[in-house]
Curated annotation (Swiss-Prot):
SUPFAM superfamilies: P-loop containing nucleoside triphosphate hydrolases (SSF52540), Rhodanese/Cell cycle control phosphatase (SSF52821). GO terms for molecular function: transferase activity, transferring alkyl or aryl (other than methyl) groups; tRNA 2-selenouridine synthase activity. The gene is selU. Residues 12-136 form the Rhodanese domain. Involved in the post-transcriptional modification of the uridine at the wobble position (U34) of tRNA(Lys), tRNA(Glu) and tRNA(Gln). Catalyzes the conversion of 2-thiouridine (S2U-RNA) to 2-selenouridine (Se2U-RNA). Acts in a two-step process involving geranylation of 2-thiouridine (S2U) to S-geranyl-2-thiouridine (geS2U) and subsequent selenation of the latter derivative to 2-selenouridine (Se2U) in the tRNA chain. It catalyses: 5-methylaminomethyl-2-thiouridine(34) in tRNA + selenophosphate + (2E)-geranyl diphosphate + H2O + H(+) = 5-methylaminomethyl-2-selenouridine(34) in tRNA + (2E)-thiogeraniol + phosphate + diphosphate; 5-methylaminomethyl-2-thiouridine(34) in tRNA + (2E)-geranyl diphosphate = 5-methylaminomethyl-S-(2E)-geranyl-thiouridine(34) in tRNA + diphosphate; 5-methylaminomethyl-S-(2E)-geranyl-thiouridine(34) in tRNA + selenophosphate + H(+) = 5-methylaminomethyl-2-(Se-phospho)selenouridine(34) in tRNA + (2E)-thiogeraniol; 5-methylaminomethyl-2-(Se-phospho)selenouridine(34) in tRNA + H2O = 5-methylaminomethyl-2-selenouridine(34) in tRNA + phosphate. It comes from the Bacteria. This is tRNA 2-selenouridine synthase. Belongs to the SelU family. Monomer. Keywords: Selenium, Transferase. One of its GO terms (biological process) is tRNA wobble uridine modification.
Amino acid sequence: MRADTNNYRELFLRDVPMLDTRAPTEFSKGAFPGAVNLPLMDDAERQQVGLCYKQRGQDAAIALGHQLVSGPIKARRVAAWADFARAHPDGYLYCFRGGLRSQISQAWLKNEAGIEYPRVIGGYKAMRGFLLQTIDDAVAQCGFVVLGGMTGTGKTDLLRQLDNSLDLEHHAHHRGSSFGKHAVGQPTQIDFDNRLAIDILKKRAAGHDRFVLEDESQAIGACSLPFELYRGMQEYPVVWLEDTTENRVNRILRDYVIDLCAEFVDVHGPEQGFDRFAERLRQSLDNISRRLGGERHRQLAGVMDAALAEQQRSGRVDAHRAWIAALLAQYYDPMYAYQRQRKSQRIVFAGDHQSVLQYLRDPPAVGRALKGFP
């Protein structure tokens, strides 16, 4: 039998399949990419056992657990574990702390199905701690550069052309603005942290010690940036991406109208998908109504409604350009101009897509001497 392991680094670097024996509620609050939840106890059973533990102690709780998970219930769960183990002979199982639940699952697999399957020592809690430490270690040991720029300049597009980028919006499944929600919701905070940490771990293992990330506020939708990373982002050098207003409008039209509408249609079907997309767009504008002011909000909402009606009627999207351009000129550009002014002392380079890409791939010697360019 393969030995139990506490080599968390290798588990995540190799995307090792993992069988999570925690209850569904625990799993839904946060897990690891690729982990499969095949619980020893369901939520109701776990609640009963937990109450018994508090009232009558560990031995009584264990006895109740064996009583609740017995007969056909036990057989079905062992069969599911056995199927997983056969499909993933290189995998491991775990519970919350690497204690009784994973040990019992191990024993049942061996005794009932004849399969010896290793567990993760320390379980979910230890792996979660390892990933959080991975982020803090990177902040302390690596260099970081912040990619800034006006809305629609294509910062995310550029990041995806770099091997050493950390795409925070990708991990958060949110574009980082009032209009940033996708058709499908965001991961939990724990899942966001875990995905980011594994990304960092793999890139450091590939030899990267300098990372580029997009300028973000502390929260990307419902996901908050790790505290030490966000604090560092207030000090890291900034590279500023520039583009024409026309290109920016085209890019926003692509991301927030064409692609977003397609997402909703894929998830909900043509008719309901378009209705939900239109409602999301209107709600996003409503979210900034107070900052826009009542009259300006009403004007933009009217232009947006007309564009949505034209899109639904004919499939044409050009009418959206009017409210996009107005929103840039009246709201986003003044806000970003103020932010650029505040960051002016940290801006080490500014240019168009190609020049910024070249700079970030091969920063000059003077840039490497700055904090963030080790």
